């Protein structure tokens, strides 16, 4: 990076934002590739979002990662959104196309990436999605894009799973009966297992893992290995951690902004940060 260059400004917005890995990932990439850019964390209360978008336009902010609770409410504030945003009703990426401030959703691409790199076998066709929030919507859309259409959805809140099931024409089952589904692929989109008050919890009964084998995919990436993944691995399941999805969706964001992919050093910086805690 030329020290005399004025860096392009990017950000990650959410509320509360907490400790985001996006600045570490993207700023390491800018530095490694010699791109004059910096990504800053911005904690934006919901009522301040319209004013923030005005600031994006006025201050020539070149892009942003968007996280909860803004993924839906930001859409009407933009000039244009991609078909992925229209399909999912959520945007996680801001970028410019000429004079148009646009929104995209790279969550679906990030979710699909590890399943495309190492696809399920021809026999692994039945999927159980645990949780029915925004990430679950991206997961379901990604699964369908991969031709995996035998999907059952379950959530602690029955109404949430019913809404998602109706939108995507899925089967639904009560949370208490989730272990009764004969699924080859288990996908956790809940916060169960996340570092903090849920860290010692798992979204799926331990004893049920022994009944079959398949793929266990956890979108949670803090801690690096969740209880769900640890127990699934011990039972012989292939496991996919949430960091793979996080890095892949961020790679698509970085590519949109710069035309370059994230370098390995940026990915390793995030892995090192997670495994050090």
Curated annotation (Swiss-Prot):
One of its GO terms (biological process) is aromatic amino acid family biosynthetic process. It comes from the Bacteria. Pathway: Metabolic intermediate biosynthesis; chorismate biosynthesis; chorismate from D-erythrose 4-phosphate and phosphoenolpyruvate: step 4/7. Its EC number is 1.1.1.25. Keywords: Amino-acid biosynthesis, Aromatic amino acid biosynthesis, NADP, Oxidoreductase. SUPFAM superfamilies: Aminoacid dehydrogenase-like, N-terminal domain, NAD(P)-binding Rossmann-fold domains. Shikimate binds at residues 20-22, 67, 92, 107, 221. PANTHER family: BIFUNCTIONAL 3-DEHYDROQUINATE DEHYDRATASE_SHIKIMATE DEHYDROGENASE, CHLOROPLASTIC (PTHR21089:SF1), SHIKIMATE DEHYDROGENASE (PTHR21089). Involved in the biosynthesis of the chorismate, which leads to the biosynthesis of aromatic amino acids. Catalyzes the reversible NADPH linked reduction of 3-dehydroshikimate (DHSA) to yield shikimate (SA). Homodimer. Belongs to the shikimate dehydrogenase family. This is Shikimate dehydrogenase (NADP(+)). It comes from Pelobacter propionicus (strain DSM 2379 / NBRC 103807 / OttBd1).
């Amino acid at each position: 990076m030329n020290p005399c260059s004025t860096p392009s400004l990017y950000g990650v917005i959410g509320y509360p934002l907490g400790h985001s890995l996006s600045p570490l990932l993207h700023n390491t990439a800018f530095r490694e590739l010699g791109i004059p850019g910096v990504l800053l964390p911005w904690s934006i209360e919901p009522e301040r979002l319209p004013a923030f978008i005005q600031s994006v336009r006025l201050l020539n902010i070149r892009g942003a990662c968007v996280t909860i609770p803004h993924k839906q409410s930001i859409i009407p504030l933009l000039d244009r959104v991609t078909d992925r945003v229209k399909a999912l009703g959520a945007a996680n990426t801001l970028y410019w196309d000429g004079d148009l401030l646009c929104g995209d959703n790279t969550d679906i691409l990030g979710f699909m990436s590890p399943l495309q790199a190492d696809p399920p076998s021809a026999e692994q066709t039945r999927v159980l999605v645990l949780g029915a929030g925004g990430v679950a919507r991206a997961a379901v859309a990604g699964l369908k894009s991969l031709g995996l259409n035998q999907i059952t959805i379950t959530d602690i809140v029955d109404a949430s799973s019913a809404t998602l099931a109706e939108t995507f024409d899925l089967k639904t089952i009560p949370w208490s009966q989730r272990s009764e589904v004969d699924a080859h692929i288990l996908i956790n989109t809940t916060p169960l297992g996340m570092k903090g008050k849920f860290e010692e919890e798992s979204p799926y009964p331990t004893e049920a893992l022994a009944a079959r084998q398949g793929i266990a995919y956890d979108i949670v990436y803090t801690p690096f290995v969740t209880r769900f993944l640890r127990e699934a691995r011990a039972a012989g399941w292939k496991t996919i951690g949430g960091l793979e999805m996080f890095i892949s969706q961020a790679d698509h964001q970085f590519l949109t902004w710069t035309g370059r992919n994230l370098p390995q050093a940026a990915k390793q910086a995030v892995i090192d940060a997670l495994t050090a805690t």
